[in-house]
Amino acid sequence: MNYSKIFIFGIISLILMALFSSTVESVSLKNLKIKNNNNNNNNIENKHKTKKSLELTETQDFGSVKCPDGSLCPNSNTCCSASDGSYACCPTPNAQCCSDKQHCCPYQFTCGNGGNICKPQQGLRFSFNR
């Protein structure tokens, strides 16, 4: 019996189970609130003088996603409207913001069960080349 074929079959089976599972847990926006960046008092001459000023300007200097209210999310995040009217950062690019305004789902997934789960988009297919 060829053990390498059994091992490869086992790995492929695990990958397929992970890819075709019916749901994925959604990301909660509760702890992902962001600070509004409408304060334009940052002076270029002194923005790196203290640790505090460096923390305040770090996201501005290294590519950020600007939300409709002017707040910023780290690069490759998605701005989602939160239930309190502010914006929160979903930590995945091109995410789906759920209608409950408390969760988000990764790209190519849709919100289900009120936003508690993420389901693969209809018609989503995976192909494996040999």
From Swiss-Prot:
Positions of disulphide bridges: C67-C79, C73-C89
Gene3D superfamilies: Granulin
Signal peptide: 1-26
Residues annotated as transmembrane: none
UniProt KW keywords: Disulfide bond, Secreted, Signal
PTM comment text: Granulins are disulfide bridged.
SMART domains to which the protein is assigned, alphabetical: GRAN
Protein's name according to its UniProt entry: Granulin
Pfam families the UniProt entry points to: Granulin
Family annotation (PROSITE patterns): GRANULINS (PS00799)
Gene Ontology cellular component list: extracellular region
Organism: Dictyostelium discoideum (Social amoeba)
Recorded family membership: Belongs to the granulin family.
Lineage: Eukaryota, Amoebozoa, Evosea, Eumycetozoa, Dictyostelia
Subcellular location: Secreted
